[in-house]
């Protein structure tokens, strides 16, 4: 498994920062969560197993308490929710805890294949 050591999660502190990132970054992966969500921790662990294979993506976390208006904008009523934004537009949304293989399969459709054992799993399905 390829662990995300180079591209550690960054916290988004407010809605303005989120909007700025959408404009400035080519591609970001955002985990929408809250502090009391145990499933969010599992989702983050699964994302970290895969995201290192996609160096063009940066991983961010946005908590409900920091930017409720962003949650409302995207109709997020429960967490965890994962969204990938490419050129400022949402291209992928994952609800709940997704398996590392599922995350990899979805990301490779937008960013090409990475270099991990998930590549073999995705290509065999």
Question: Language-model segments: what does each one mean?
Answer:
Residues 41-53:
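Typically the conserved alpha-helix immediately C-terminal to a functionally engaged Cys/Sec
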Residues 1-28, 108-125:
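N-terminal leader/targeting and pre-domain segments
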Residues 37-40, 82:
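The canonical Cys-X-X-Cys-His
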Residues 33-36, 78:
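Short pre-active-site segment immediately N-terminal to redox-active cysteine/selenocysteine motifs
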Residues 9-13, 32, 55-69:
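Thiol-based oxidoreductase modules, predominantly thioredoxin-like and allied folds used
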Residues 74-83:
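Structural micro-motif
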Residues 2-3, 73-74, 100:
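Chalcogenol-based redox active-site neighborhoods
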Residues 83-124:
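Non-catalytic, surface beta->alpha helical segment in thiol-disulfide oxidoreductase systems
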């Amino acid at each position: 498994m390829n662990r995300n050591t180079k591209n550690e999660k960054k916290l988004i502190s407010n809605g303005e920062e989120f909007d700025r990132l959408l404009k400035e970054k080519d591609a970001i992966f955002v985990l929408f969560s809250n502090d009391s969500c145990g499933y969010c921790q599992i989702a983050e662990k699964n994302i970290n197993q895969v995201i290192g294979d996609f160096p063009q993506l940066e991983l961010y976390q946005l908590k409900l308490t920091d930017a409720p208006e962003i949650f409302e904008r995207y109709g997020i009523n429960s967490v965890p929710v994962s969204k990938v934004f490419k050129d400022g537009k949402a291209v992928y949304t994952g609800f709940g805890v997704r398996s590392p293989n599922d995350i990899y399969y979805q990301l490779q459709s937008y960013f090409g294949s990475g270099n991990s054992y998930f590549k073999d799993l995705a290509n065999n399905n």
